[in-house]
Each structure stands twice: as structure tokens, then as C-alpha cells.
């Protein structure tokens, strides 16, 4: 099983939606609870994200591979589908 790393920023509404989606999906599927997740605040930990290729948050990585990068037009359903796809890939 692989670890998912979520890059986020405080006050980001898309990041709040990603967190909500993760919690909902884990509530619906016990297997998702076994996936290790790490949340990195890019403002507080710039050294951890300096070499990563992304512009928008939230962004989800599995190892060094980017699985999802939010865009300003993404609605909750798009974010939820993307979080689910990342969880499925991590299993």
C-alpha cells in the first residue's frame, strides 16, 4: 500500500473540499482508512515542496508521481472523484 501526500494551504477552499471528500470516502469504504495520508502545508514547509512540480493546491502525490492537481474551476464532485481515484491507486 502506498502513502498519499496532500499539499495544501491554510484558507484554501479547494483544500477544505479535498479533506471533506477524503473523510467521506473513508467513511464509505473501510479499505480507504488503511491508506496512509500526509498533509503538508506549503506555507509552513516550503523546503518540503520546493522541488515538486505543481502550481495549485490541493495537489496529491504518491511518491514522486503527481496524481491530481486542483484547478480553480474544479467543483466538489471533481475533487471528490480525484481523491477517490488517488485512494484507489494507493490500495
Where are these regions (language model features)?
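Thiol-based oxidoreductase modules, predominantly thioredoxin-like and allied folds used
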Residues: 8, 31-46
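Non-catalytic, surface beta->alpha helical segment in thiol-disulfide oxidoreductase systems
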Residues: 62-91
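Local sequence-structure signature of Cys/Sec-based thiol-disulfide redox active-site neighborhoods
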Residues: 1-28
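A short acidic, often aromatic-flanked loop/helix-cap motif at beta-alpha or helix-coil junctions
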Residues: 45-48, 76
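Generic recognition of short, well-ordered alpha-helical segments
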Residues: 16-20, 51-52, 74
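Structural micro-motif
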Residues: 51-62
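Alpha-helix termini
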Residues: 26-32, 87-90
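Non-catalytic interaction surface on structured domains
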Residues: 19-22, 30-34, 61, 65, ...
Amino acid at each position: 500500500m502506498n502513502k498519499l501526500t496532500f499539499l495544501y494551504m491554510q484558507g484554501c477552499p479547494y483544500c477544505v473540499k479535498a479533506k471533506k471528500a477524503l473523510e467521506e470516502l473513508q467513511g464509505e469504504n473501510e479499505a480507504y482508512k488503511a491508506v496512509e495520508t500526509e498533509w503538508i502545508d506549503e506555507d509552513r514547509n516550503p523546503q518540503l515542496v520546493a522541488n515538486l512540480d505543481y502550481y495549485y493546491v490541493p495537489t496529491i502525490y504518491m511518491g514522486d508521481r503527481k496524481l491530481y492537481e486542483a484547478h480553480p474551476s474544479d467543483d466538489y464532485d471533481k475533487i471528490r472523484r480525484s481523491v477517490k481515484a488517488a485512494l484507489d491507486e494507493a490500495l
